[in-house]
A protein has these predicted regions:
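Domain-level signal for Mg2+-assisted phosphodiester chemistry and nucleotide/NA-binding surfaces
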Residues: 1-73, 123-127
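Nuclease catalytic cores that cleave nucleic-acid phosphodiester bonds
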Residues: 51-175
Length: 175
């Protein structure tokens, strides 16, 4: 858990780690390895006991402001809602006394406000990905930490990463 907490130390146990993402099927034409690479990463997370939940990308027609050409843009949908729902579920089931959210997404602000109102004794910590500080979430959380670039390098998965069945997954250059 020191990987997530950095310089924030608090006694306690890690009960569950949840990972929320979406498979970018729409990028397959640009980078055919996008989804298979992501699926390999998910296998590694599962092997570490991390529970993942996948959302989706939704295509949306957009108009270029400069040339007025229409194009399709893909937006990740439901991930923030899934995180908010899991946050409230975990708190409702009394599974923890501290929540650590690794995000810079302001869309989670209402869920954090609700969690603090309904469960005032819970400590909420926000970890901000490198260069993704969020003032609103910082104010809402009990404490917040900015993850430094070197933290990512320091806490990479083993390369290769060995799954419980002996399968080895090599780290792609883009990880």
């Amino acid at each position: 858990m020191s990987i997530l907490y950095g310089n924030y130390r608090q006694k306690g146990n890690t009960n569950d780690i949840f990972y929320f993402s979406a498979l970018a099927h729409h990028r397959q034409l640009i980078d055919p390895d996008t989804v298979p690479r992501h699926k390999k990463y998910l296998k590694c997370l599962r092997a570490l006991g991390i529970v993942y939940q996948l959302s989706r990308f939704k295509p949306r027609e957009t108009l270029c402001r400069n040339c007025h050409t229409k194009y399709i843009k893909h937006e990740e949908k439901e991930t923030d809602v899934a995180i908010a729902a899991k946050l409230l579920e975990v708190l409702h089931l009394n599974k923890c006394d501290t929540i650590v959210l690794l995000t810079g997404d302001t869309d989670l602000a209402p869920a954090i406000k609700t969690a603090k109102t309904l469960f005032p004794k819970i400590t909420i910590v926000c970890l901000f990905p490198y260069k993704r500080h969020n003032d609103e979430l910082a104010k809402l959380s009990h404490t917040h930490i900015k993850i430094k670039a070197e933290t990512y390098t320091k806490h990479q998965l083993a390369d290769p990463f060995e799954l419980p069945d002996g399968t080895k997954i090599s780290k792609p250059p883009s990880w």
